[in-house]
Amino acid sequence: MSSGGLLLLLGLLTLCAELIPVSSRQRHRDCDKPPDKGNCGPVRRAFYYDTRLKTCKAFQYRGCNGNGNHFKSDHLCRCECLEYS
C-alpha cells in the first residue's frame, strides 16, 4: 500500500473514532445476520461481520435483495459492527 493510501486509512480510522464516542456507540442492527450474497447485479467484493469470529470477512455480494450485513470496505464493517462495550 502506498504512503498516500496509508495516510487515508489512518485518517478514516481517526475520523471514525472521533465522531462517535465509544460509550454511546451502537452496532448496526444487521451485524448479527448471516451473510447474504443477494441475487442480482454483478458480483462485487463486500464485507460482512462474522459474529462467531468477531471480525469482518470478505464475501461476494451481488448487489440487491441481501440483508444489511454487507459493507463496501473492511473499515466500514469494523466501524459499524465491532462491539464497543
From Swiss-Prot:
GO terms for cellular component: extracellular space. Disulfide bonds join C31-C81, C40-C64, C56-C77. Residues 1-24 form the signal peptide. InterPro entries: Kunitz_BPTI, Kunitz_BPTI_sf, Prtase_inh_Kunz-CS, Serpin_venom_toxin. It holds the Pfam family Kunitz_BPTI. It is found in: Secreted. Gene3D superfamilies: Pancreatic trypsin inhibitor Kunitz domain (4.10.410.10). Residues 31-81 form the BPTI/Kunitz inhibitor domain. One of its GO terms (molecular function) is serine-type endopeptidase inhibitor activity. PROSITE patterns: BPTI_KUNITZ_1, BPTI_KUNITZ_2. Expressed by the venom gland. Its main location: secreted. Keywords: Disulfide bond, Ion channel impairing toxin, Neurotoxin, Potassium channel impairing toxin, Presynaptic neurotoxin, Secreted, Signal, Toxin, Voltage-gated potassium channel impairing toxin. Heterodimer; disulfide-linked. The A chains have phospholipase A2 activity and the B chains show homology with the basic protease inhibitors. Belongs to the venom Kunitz-type family. Beta-bungarotoxins are presynaptic neurotoxins of the venom. The B chain is homologous to venom basic protease inhibitors but has no protease inhibitor activity and blocks voltage-gated potassium channels (Kv). This is Kunitz-type serine protease inhibitor homolog beta-bungarotoxin B3 chain. It comes from Bungarus multicinctus (Many-banded krait).
